Structure formats: structure tokens, C-alpha cells
Amino acid sequence: LQEIIVRIAGMQRQPVPEIKPRAAVIFCADNGVVAEGVTQCGQDVTATVTRNMGKGKSTMCLMAKSLGMDVYPVDIGVAETVDKNGVIDRKIRFGTENIADNPALPRAQAITAIETGIEMAEMCAAKGYRLICGGEMGIGNTTTSAAVAAVLTGEPVRSLTGRGAGLSSAGLQRKMQVIECAIANHAPDISDPIDVISK
């Protein structure tokens, strides 16, 4: 914790960092790989939680409120239409492709997603936030993030893949198999992080 505080103080160029006001920006999107049975619940949960965040009623929002933190949910790729009631609409597409069959999304859309993150950080800075936390919501995200981590670190998929939100042992085996096959089939270029993200 001390190391983090020192880094924040360095970024702010002051001996005692200011971390108020603070905001959490939660990027919400669906993953097509859910079709492979790699999660315990359905894709529709992403939209439900996104809507609840927009109303300030999700568990995350309640925890953030107790810390005096504002929450900005961003629909960057939820598989269904989410009303703009408290949700920032930056939808790039309605969910990604199923990485078991195809790359997750075109390179240009991966770049747009990164640019959206930059836009949200700039928005928060313009509003005067001193600390911005980024987060994600999307059923299947631990599958795609494990795939990205395996490629970028060179670590075995099996050492990076977990049960997510309570996957069974058989489901976990299926999840690892899907990730390993996706990496082998799409051959992401480790020297090009955007290629890794998009595949």
C-alpha cells in the first residue's frame, strides 16, 4: 500500500496525495465465448448488472458509495440494448465474437475500445477526480482475460485460468480447453498487444 501511495504522490507531484474526489469507471461488454459453456450463468446477466449499476443498485455501487466514490458504468459492448438511464453509451458492438471460432473483434474495434478508455479517463479528469479506478463487467470476461494473460506472459493457460463466478470442475476443464484452442487457432502476435487483445 505504501508503494502505491508513493507512486500516486509522485504522479500528483506533491508529498501527500489527494485521492478525493474519486471515481470508478466500469466498462461493460459481453464475450461470445460464453456459447462454449465456460461460465455458470448466461450472458443476459451482463445487461442486468449494467442496468443495476446505472441505477446505483449493484453491489459494486453500494461498496463504492460507502467509500464516497462515484460510479460510471459504460456500455462498450453489452450483447443487448441497454437504456442510457445512468449508463454511458459507447457501444462498439453487441458483444464479441466467440473466440473458439473467430478472433474476438476486428483490430479497429479493439483500438476504439482503448480510445474509449482514454476518453473516460479524460472525462473524469475534467470533472476534477483525483483518483480513477477502472473495472469491468461481463459474463465470460475471465475466459478472455486468461487468454490474453497467457499470451502476454507465456504462462500456461492452466495456471492462469480460474472458476470465475463458481464454475464446476468439468466447466473449468472446458474453459481451459477452449482458451488453449483459441490461442492455437488465432496465433496472436505477442509483439503486438492490440493483435493479442483483438484475437
Describe each PLM feature range.
Residues L1-K199:
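N-terminal loops that bind phosphate or other acidic moieties
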